[in-house]
C-alpha cells in the first residue's frame, strides 16, 4: 500500500503559503509559485540590506557636497582638509551638522580651507 504522508506534506506546504501571505495573485495560493516568490523575496531582502547602507552614504555625501559648495569649496578638498587637520568626523555626523548646525559646519569648512 502506498503511503502519501498527508499531514507532513500539508504542514510543509502550509508553511510556505503562510510565508507568502499578502503576495499578489497565485503567489499567495499556489505552493510552487509561493515557494519561488518567498525565496526570491529573501534574496531581495539580503541584497537590499547591503544596498541601504550604500544609499545612506550617498545621501550624506551629496548633502555635505551641497553645503560645502555654498562656501565655494569642493567635497573632495573639504574631506582632504579635514583629514590633514586630524579631524575625524564621519559623514553621517557631517551631514547632520550641515543641516542642523550651519555655523559649526562653516567653522569646519574654514578649518579645512586653512589646512590646504
UniProtKB/Swiss-Prot annotation:
CDD domains from the xrefs? Ribosomal_L20
PROSITE patterns, alphabetized: RIBOSOMAL_L20
What's an example GO BP annotation here? translation
InterPro entries of this UniProt entry?
A: Ribosomal_bL20, RIBOSOMAL_L20_CS, Ribosomal_protein_bL20_C
Keyword Ion transport among record annotations = no
Which molecular-function annotations from GO does this UniProt entry contain? rRNA binding; structural constituent of ribosome
Alphabetically sorted, this entry's keywords are:
Ribonucleoprotein, Ribosomal protein, RNA-binding, rRNA-binding
What Gene Ontology terms describe where this protein resides (cellular component)?
ribonucleoprotein complex; ribosome
Q: What does this protein do?
A: Binds directly to 23S ribosomal RNA and is necessary for the in vitro assembly process of the 50S ribosomal subunit. It is not involved in the protein synthesizing functions of that subunit.
Q: What does the sequence similarity comment in the record state about its family?
A: Belongs to the bacterial ribosomal protein bL20 family.
Designated name of the protein: Large ribosomal subunit protein bL20
